[in-house]
Amino acid sequence: MAVAERLRHLFRLLSQIRPVWVTILVVSALLNFVVYLGHVRAFFSENDFRLYYAGAQVGLRYGWSHIYDTHLEQAAVAALRPAGPWYALLTPAPITWLVAPLTLIGYLDAYWVWVALSLAALGAALWYARPRHYSAALYFTWWAALGPLWFSAYEGQITILVAAALLAGWRLLETRRDFLGGVILSLALFKPHLVLLLPLALLVAGRFRALLGFATVAAVAGVGMLVTLHPDGIQAYVSTLLVPKPGGDTAETLRSALGGGTAVLAIQAAAVIAAVLVAAHARRARAAWPLVVSALLGSFLLAPYWHPQDYLVLDVAAAIMLAAGPVGAGVLIAAAVAIVSTPVSPLNNRQGSKEMILAWLLFAIAFLGFLGVRALKRRERPTTGRQSALPPSIGSSASRRFQSQGPARDVSLNADVERFEAG
């Protein structure tokens, strides 16, 4: 009865405050859009797409083995108009292959086409991975209220495609298409530091076919880089990665925020252990969402560098939790990430304020801690126990709503979630 009472109270509370938080989300989305337009006008010359575009130009003109040549890259960036500062290209070489066709239409047009295609891909992934038990309009409004999405759009960042791949790949795992899910998830390797723990989580969770798909694409990309970059290009790329990062690149990492030391190592070790525990429990429960979410959160805490647009993957973690996790916890996480994403948005704190950094770190630690403790404390019990605690009215209406809004395969997803909660 206690569970039933909590559910009744939660549903009553959500229905009472729904107009308020819908209004807040709409206002936040509009404000983000206004600030985004201001950034495009004032800081267009500083976007990250320039680096992809310049790298593609260098590869086409001088050979792909030269795309990490500092002098050639600097010259290519300086030739773009409007001119802006140069930053080292840290993204793996396939990003330049992807952008290369867009060099045919010129830099300005290429930027807008790239952003439009990226947002279209994300929109398709959002629709595919959307929660079936919430309004799609509300879900998309929630996404529009998240600052990292708008900042990534301004930057022309590959992070948007990474987010799309993570959402679509997760949903494929939930529907038992593991190999294809692993292939799609591997697209996140455009920014490897965002998914450091994902292969380990797939391994521990027993998702071997997904890991095979992930590793296959990674191997093909690796061979492609070896063939096109040659030893000199590989050495130049490794040197770029090993060069001490500017303060702006590392300021938003756990190590930088806490100043290094034993505390950082302890938190990072705990993050790895928590991700492993969650993945092991997800293996027994046959659910994919916990392992993907915990891997993303743990990767953030381990990352050697982090940029404002990278917070988009934490928004992805919250979106997956909202779609597949426990209802109450999912709503709270979604509300928390909206709060963190908006008032301290990277659109308003381009260099990363201490408040923004600490807010994200605390969010990730609390979120991962919740999943880890949950996996540790849950004991095996029949899944019917939880179902019997639901009031008949809630259970039947929720079941009808779920079946009417989602495809048949989501019934298995819901069952997996139930097993994870009960297992």
Name what the model sees in each region.
Residues A2-L180, L202-V327, V344-P346, M356, ...:
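Primarily membrane-embedded glycan-assembly and transfer machineries that use lipid-linked glycans
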